[in-house]
């Protein structure tokens, strides 16, 4: 499973908040961050299936003869924009459902109130959407590599025939 980390541009904020005794609030924020991404990922399957259905013979041959991540790269090229468009409203809803904005605003407001702190305010919807999509492609790339390199991972008859 992929874990979405605290936003990079807010890492200093995280460190500072933990130092001032807010570890449990930071942990809760990270849990809700990942819950929002998980909600969005359920829509990936239909988008990936559609991309595979639109695949040409040339695409299939390139994937078959390609590197360990050729299929992943194909899916990334064919689906990234559509995944973003589908995921972002779901992420927005999920953020509301799990009160992520409440957690983020509380953390950001307390951090921003500290003297000498560099103010933070990243776009959580965009961050979570992109991290969820990137996480999916990491999982797909790992699975693809395993299928290509390990005959036991080729669990379907079709995969066994393709990689003979």
Where are these regions (language model features)?
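Soluble periplasmic/extracytoplasmic beta-strand elements of cell-envelope proteins
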Residues: 1-5, 63, 158-161
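An amphipathic alpha-helical core segment
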Residues: 82, 86, 90-131
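Generic alpha-helical structural element
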Residues: 37, 72, 76, 121, ...
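N-terminal Sec/ER secretory leader and immediately downstream segment
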Residues: 1-32
């Amino acid at each position: 499973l992929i874990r979405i980390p605290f936003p990079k541009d807010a890492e200093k904020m995280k460190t500072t908040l933990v130092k001032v005794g807010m570890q449990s609030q930071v942990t809760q924020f990270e849990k809700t961050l990942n819950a929002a991404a998980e909600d969005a990922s359920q829509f990936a399957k239909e988008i990936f299936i559609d991309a595979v259905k639109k695949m040409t013979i040339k695409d299939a041959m390139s994937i078959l003869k390609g590197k360990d991540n050729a299929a992943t790269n194909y899916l990334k090229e064919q689906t990234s924009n559509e995944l973003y468009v589908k995921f972002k409203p779901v992420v927005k809803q999920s953020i509301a459902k799990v009160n992520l904005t409440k957690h983020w605003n509380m953390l950001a407001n307390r951090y921003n109130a500290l003297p000498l702190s560099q103010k933070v305010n990243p776009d959580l919807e965009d961050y979570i959407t992109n991290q969820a999509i990137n996480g999916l492609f990491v999982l797909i790339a790992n699975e693809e590599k395993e299928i290509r390199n390990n005959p036991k991972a080729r669990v379907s008859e079709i995969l066994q025939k393709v990689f003979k």
